[in-house]
Amino acid sequence: CSFERIYFSRGSDVDIYKERKRLGEKLVPKILKAINNDIDHTVFSFIPNTAEVAFYGMLQGLDDYLNEEKVQQIAALGHNPNMEELEVILSRRIRSEKVAIKDIKLRTFIAEGNSRNDLAAHVYDITYGSLVPGVDNLVIIDDSIVRGTTLKQSIIGILDRLGPKKIVIVSSSPQVRYPDYYGIDMAKMSEFIAFRAAIELLKERDMKDVIAAAYRKSKDQVGLPKEQMVNYVKDIYAPFTDEEISAKMVELLTPKGTKAKVEIVYQPLEGLHEACPNHLGDWYFSGNYPTPGGVKMVNQAFINYIAVSYTHLRAH
């Protein structure tokens, strides 16, 4: 199970340490795109504490990229380079800071419901003076973005206080789109920010018929043996790219009054598989459950979601 390795397993295990580092490294091309390759005006950081190892992997990948740039710049100087020009090139560094500080006495996932929201605002603080306001981008890596509660209630707001030109939030795992039924407490569809974003996109683009069709097909197979059931929740995501869903998440999670431009970058599924080649269990990201029971449960979770959110569909 890959999510367990990203989030729950002990980071002291050598294989898990290497996998988490690779997850950070795999994100470098997407991060560079998000900041228009402007390394000189970007500060890199992480959400403490579980994302720290992926952060080191990301820094390693960025160092490799910067070294390639330096080689090309030095080569362009010719056979008799000017010392000052060389010094300018060699002085370029990846700028990393500990921007967010976590109060270790508090943990958002301990609290349930409304108390979780109250907690979220008090878990993090920031280091002032860690970037140049209005000039620098801020790239901050987290291990996963599941509900988005802490981002909305706390993190984006406090990072914005530093005055970055752009905030890029990077998830070392892919978009969590489906519930887990094998020991991790993630059972309701409405909890997932990826699912909420896809539903919003369907509404916006006048594609509510996709929701109705997925519901009808899910309802029609309730009496079937679980081995014959299909995960029709995939139809909710099918019309959109990962980037479209991420962009809608930004709209849903960015608090009013945020001055910086915000972007969310997720690990692609292929990046996850390359980083964790021996642990391909990815059902919360892909919807490919390892047992028929998982398909039956996600089917029911979607029906339950419609029952609460779309009373007019329930009658069909």
At which residue positions do the language-model features occur?
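Phosphate-binding active sites in nucleotide-utilizing proteins
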Residues: R20, K26-I35, D40-L59, E69-K70, ...
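Extended, hydrophobic alpha-helical segments in both membrane/secreted and soluble proteins
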Residues: A51-M58, N137-I158
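Conserved small/polar residues in nucleotide/adenosyl-binding loops
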Residues: T311-H316
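Short, glycine/charge-rich flexible loops or terminal/linker lids adjacent to PRPP-binding catalytic cores
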Residues: Q60-N137, R177-S190
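Acidic, metal-coordinating catalytic segment for phosphate/diphosphate chemistry
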Residues: R177-Y305
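Flexible loop/turn segments at secondary-structure boundaries
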Residues: T50-F55, D103-T108, V146-T149, P174-D180, ...
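Residues at the starts of beta-strands that form the adenosine-phosphate
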Residues: R95, N137, K165-V168, E263
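Active-site-facing substrate-recognition patch
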Residues: C1-N36, G113-D118
